[in-house]
Amino acid sequence: MTVCIAAACDNGERIVTATDGLLSMGDVTGEGIPGKMLWYGDWQFMYAGTPSIFSLVMEEIENASINDPQVLSRRHVQETILHAYQKVRSRLASFPFLSPFNMTIEDFKQDGLNAFGETFHNEVLRAISDEARRADDQLLVTGWGMSPLSAMVYEVGPSGDRLHTKSGFGAIGSGSQMAYTMLILLEQARYRTLAETIFNVACAKFFSEKSKDLDVGKMTAVCVLRKRTGEDEADKACRQFVSLEDLDILRSIWDQHLRPRIPDEARIEITGIAARVNAGNITPHDMVKHFKAQQRINEKRGISSQAPLSPQSTKDDS
């Protein structure tokens, strides 16, 4: 599906977010520009799931804010997001079963029992519930309240909503567990610096590319957010994307120093261990890996791998 990550840093003064660029339309997937970061005011919205469903949720939020701009204040924004998510999810889950009767979910709750009778009403209710459980769309929303350090990392999904204030970071999508694992291993926390957090979040994104079904795209977007101050121009965005060149540097560091792999030195030892417990037999795969590992070790030590080492006489032949 995807991965979206957010982590507060500098004691809540900044938030670093990341996502991939993989889009899924039924059985078809492809990578384009990372369009999973959207803004409404200074709130950043990221989603995991179907783009069109996310658009429906955003439209509900926008309609609510037109009637009352305060619904997007720090005090009310979570309630607004949750209500919009629930409304869209309920409508989509009920539509296949109620639309043949020209009935909405509101109509069903009010008149369904009288209209259908208890037996059929309960069957329809179970069908709607089963359909709702199939939904896996998630939202991750970040921003600030009135306090300069009140960074909010808020998550909404099929199992409910969560506020990641204590940990300071959250992740959604199929790659979320891999992302969480890397953030925890790197000891990410709100007190981490901006530099450390950019690195940690990028590594969490790269690590998530090995998630279930390999459905996290390699294309990466990393954005640094900060709280708006009185000195900022009203129409100026309080965010900065990490450049593609810097993302390449981060991925190179990840590949060279942090990506999990069997070290060359370990490869030499484990090949011998396997041979000792397997009657001296070594698989062709292990032999090739062993040879290549030894070549790289020799290159590091400045030893030629073109010919085997042989002892040389130190006696003067003259």
Question: What does each model-identified segment do?
Answer:
Residues 204, 226-228, 248-254:
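Accessory, usually C-terminal, subdomains that scaffold auxiliary metal cofactors
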